[in-house]
Amino acid sequence: MIKSKGWNWKMVEDDSNCVWKIPSIESYYLLDRWKGLGFKSFLDLGCGLGRHTVLFASNDFKTYGFDISEDGLTRTKEWLDSLDLKADLKKGDMIHLPYKDNSFDCILCRNVISHQDTEGVKQIIKELYRVLKDNGECYLTLGSKSTWGFKQTSWPLVDENTRLRMEEGPEYKTPHFYADYDLIKVLFKDFKIEFINHIEDFYESNDKTYSSFHYHVLIKKVK
């Protein structure tokens, strides 16, 4: 198992236009869904700068934020404090979560668990199962083997599903795990898979258009 490595958030500007401070589109769907299911306890796994921690805390969830980055957690706390919101923030490695069994109704980990190799991802999934309550749900994303990053052969191959990102920036030398539909079915065999979506995102940079593919997966813990 490769050593876990988080983002270098010091390289990311902290302003209102920062994409990492804007809640993802699907987080609003999850907020509505999980409220409707009567869920109360929420874990933002890999909370980064706190965009989803703040969203759920401001909507009366008992909110927990977890990240490997001290800087990310510091900036999350500052944001919460500025809004007079509360959340339980912890620093650590997601392969060993510091929470009791059956702690959470719902977990969101967007572009998070992919930052490990295959063995690490399997261990994280075990932890997700452990800390979720029965009938609790987890929404997560995984890099797709259809995306450019997996095909980027200049990035070292860690194992058959994982490459080490060598592009300069906040993710430099961070492992990136990639999956396909069949692998996802195997990885989450102990859960009920509510849905799997394969989504292509487009973005502009230096007058060029780029895209990347991710799997969006909603799972439920069932006995």
Question: What does each of the following model-derived ranges do?
Answer:
Residues 109-112:
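A short beta-strand submotif of the Rossmann-like class I SAM-dependent methyltransferase core
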Residues 122-134:
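A short glycine-rich, Lys/Arg-flanked "PGG" loop and its adjoining helix->strand segment in the class I
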